């Protein structure tokens, strides 16, 4: 995969910039960490070269100076809110993340339960955490938050919250998902630190939108497509423009909330150290692109991927018509159609030629490989075989898996497992190749090509099964599907 982002440069300049921000405030910096620390696949897709755990690796540069506070809303505990990408509840994800952080040497000092007003489910969760030695703090709901500044900046507002004991100069505040109350936790701590005579500051780490790229840069447009369900909108930061005469990009929620933050800061310190939402940020990603065109093309692919993802969920019954329409509008404004994705055009051509479900993959060198479904194989399984043969230099007419092996597998699927689709999926094809590779040199060579799929793009003219989707994801393949059920 062509690289467009300098990962090593990012680790260096991002950690150094955070150190400078800590020094700006004196004793302590509360850093609100938006987005995902682990598995940031959106960033890795639009910035080829950015690793899914790049932000985590960056924090490891600061491990001796940093501690982590996990935040979870009592509302999310009560309704068992699910993290969509992992399929686990937020309360379980807090424990998962804590374990992941500590396994790599990062210190987690506690968990804050926000929006607390006596929920029994929150009390039970607190007891569960305390039994395994985790410090837990309650932060209460505040009437009129965030606009009732007089109450917020008082002993009945932030002063009512549990004071979180911290010991290190950098306090990273993170959560399983949005709406958990990370910013309020940071501001509450500023209030309570100030009362104790401790100089503390606040900064915000948001990967997107990238503040020093143009508003309509494909990377920023891709972020808008990714958050279409939240109705986020990228905007020119008018406060930054007024203060410095410099055009920067932020998103609507931060711009809308800034006057309130300004009043809260003034209530705590007497003045606001920041003149704009952009000032609050510490993101240095925009300085680390090594090939902007590679990143721009990847971002365009991501916009189209989001378009198909929304259409697929809508076809499966999701109530997301607004999201579908918004992404369609984003594509129109970006003068982007699905034909930009070469695999889409190729897969549809094969479908028309053979009158069957089809799929196509674009390899790293730009080669397009196509496949259609047959009585033996689904389109994705056939595509894996065709692509590995091409990469291994095996003639197309060579059959890697003999029909005599496929047919017994089909019989088991239908006769004994009561399946309706006898065709082999990608996982079944890969298992068959693995078994044959011990005696068949072609199968061994074909399997050895699998790492070359990382970063490749695939389009299918039908929606694939969950099994096939997971295999493509594990191989690092970017998948899109027409919203048509098999």
Regions found by a protein language model. Give the residues of each.
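Residue-level recognition of the N-termini of beta-strands and the immediately preceding loop/turn
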Residues: 108-109, 357-358, 398-402
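Short HxH-centered metal-ligating active-site micro-motif
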Residues: 390-422
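Hydrophobic positions on the alpha1 helix immediately C-terminal to the Walker A/P-loop
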Residues: 185
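Feature captures eukaryotic membrane-trafficking machinery centered on endolysosomal pathways
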Residues: 349-377
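A short, polar/charged loop-to-alpha-helix boundary motif
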Residues: 376-392
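Conserved glycine(s) of the Walker
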Residues: 180-181
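P-loop (Walker A) phosphate-binding loop of NTP-binding proteins
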Residues: 176-177
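Flexible phosphate-sensing "switch/lid" loops adjacent to ATP/NTP-binding sites
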Residues: 1-173, 189-348, 356, 363-365, ...
């Amino acid at each position: 995969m062509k690289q467009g982002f300098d990962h090593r440069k990012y680790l260096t300049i991002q950690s150094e910039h955070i150190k400078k921000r800590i020094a700006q405030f004196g004793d302590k910096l509360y850093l609100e960490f938006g987005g995902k620390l682990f598995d940031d696949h959106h960033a890795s897709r639009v910035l080829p070269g950015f690793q899914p755990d790049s932000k985590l690796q960056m924090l490891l540069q600061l491990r001796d100076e940093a501690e982590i506070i996990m935040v979870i809303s009592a509302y999310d505990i009560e309704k068992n809110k699910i993290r969509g990408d992992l399929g686990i509840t937020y309360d379980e994800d807090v424990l998962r993340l804590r374990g992941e952080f500590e396994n790599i040497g990062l210190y987690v000092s506690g968990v804050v339960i926000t929006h607390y007003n006596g929920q029994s489910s929150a009390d039970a969760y607190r007891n569960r955490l305390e039994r395994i030695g985790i410090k837990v703090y309650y932060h209460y709901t505040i009437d009129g938050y965030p606009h009732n500044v007089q109450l917020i900046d008082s002993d009945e507002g932030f002063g009512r919250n549990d004071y979180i004991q911290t010991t290190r100069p950098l306090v990273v505040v993170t959560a399983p998902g949005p709406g958990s109350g990370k910013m309020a936790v940071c501001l509450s701590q500023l209030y309570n630190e100030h009362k104790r005579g401790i100089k503390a500051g606040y900064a915000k780490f948001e990967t997107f939108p990238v503040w020093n790229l143009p508003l309509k840069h494909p990377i920023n447009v891709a972020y808008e497509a990714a958050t279409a369900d939240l109705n986020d909108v990228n905007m020119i930061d008018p406060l930054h423009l007024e203060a410095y005469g410099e055009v920067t990009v932020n998103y609507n929620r931060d711009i809308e909330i800034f006057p309130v933050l300004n009043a809260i800061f003034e209530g705590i310190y007497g003045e606001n150290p920041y003149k704009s939402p952009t000032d609050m940020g510490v993101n240095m990603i925009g300085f680390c692109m090594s090939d902007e065109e590679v990143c721009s093309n990847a971002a365009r692919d991501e916009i189209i991927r989001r378009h198909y993802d929304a259409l697929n969920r809508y076809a499966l019954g999701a109530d997301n018509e607004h999201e579908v329409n918004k992404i369609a509008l984003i594509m129109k404004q970006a003068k982007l159609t699905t034909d930009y994705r070469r695999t889409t055009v190729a897969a549809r051509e094969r479908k028309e030629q053979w009158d069957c479900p089809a799929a196509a993959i674009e390899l790293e060198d730009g080669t397009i490989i196509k496949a259609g479904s047959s009585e033996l194989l689904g389109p994705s399984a056939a595509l894996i075989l065709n692509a590995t043969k091409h990469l291994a230099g095996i003639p197309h007419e060579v059959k890697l898996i003999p029909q005599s092996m496929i047919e017994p597998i089909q019989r088991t699927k239908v006769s004994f497992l009561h399946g309706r689709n006898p065709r082999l999926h990608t996982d079944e094809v890969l298992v068959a190749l693995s078994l044959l590779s011990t005696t068949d040199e072609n199968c061994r060579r074909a399997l050895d090509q699998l790492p070359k799929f990382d970063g490749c793009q695939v389009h299918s003219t039908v929606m694939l099964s969950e099994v096939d989707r997971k295999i493509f994801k594990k191989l690092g393949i970017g998948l899109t599907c027409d919203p048509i059920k098999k």
